[in-house]
Amino acid sequence: MESTDVNHSTAWAPGGMAHIISEAVIAGSIGLYFWKKISALEQTVQELQSQLEVQNNQLQWLIQQQTRRLAVSPLAVSPLAVSPLPPQRDYRQQSTTTNAAGNNGAYPSFQFKPPKTAIKGDAAPPQATPKMQCDNGVCKLVRPLQATHGKGARAPSPEKKTVSISKIAKQIEFEHDQIAPARTATTQVSTFSKPSPNPVLRSITPNPSIGEGRDGDESGPSARALDKILNDIDCE
């Protein structure tokens, strides 16, 4: 019995040691992995802390610069530093006072006089009222002509004016009648009254299967068909 127990212990000893070694290797690798991760996290935390410190320093510097600018801003300048403008003198009032006192002032006053538009002895022309004038059943208001001012000016008579207008109207009508046919002739566009033929390609040469007429007569069906085609072309 003792020999059998010794044999069993010697047989299982290498397998048990290998199992223990593998477990130790696995535990060591897991510990190494977590240690690397923790060290990487610590490094990132340190970098973030350094960046925060730099940003805080920049903000403090900007705040200091802003306070300095506000302290030396142009709004803080006292109003006493700006000298007030001297009062402006009223030269018109001074000139009137000097002239009233009889002294010759440095700035004499000038009286403005409007230009004379009307000539002496000329009165305003009376406003003419329009009159009703009827001609061939058509009535219209006609304003009478007013006499012009000045010597030698003469108003035309209404008869001459109406005659000249009627002549111009007749001349315009005559020219319109003479020009209208020429314009219509140039503007008219000539179009085809007949519809265009069907664009079908036809052979002008006679069909060899039909042949000529009997006894060399050329007035057969092929010649008649050719004449018909030529007549259609001439008509178009």
UniProtKB/Swiss-Prot annotation:
Listed transmembrane segments: 15-34
Record's compositionally biased regions (Polar residues): 93-102, 185-195
Region (Disordered): 83-113, 185-236
Comp. bias regions, Basic and acidic residues: 225-236
Membrane association type: Single-pass membrane protein
Protein source organism: Invertebrate iridescent virus 3 (IIV-3)
Name of the molecule in the record: Uncharacterized protein 124R
The keyword Lipid metabolism belongs to this UniProt entry's keyword annotation: no
Entry GO terms, CC: membrane
Coiled-coil positions: 36-71
Main location: membrane
Keyword Cell division: no
Source organism, top-level taxon: Viruses
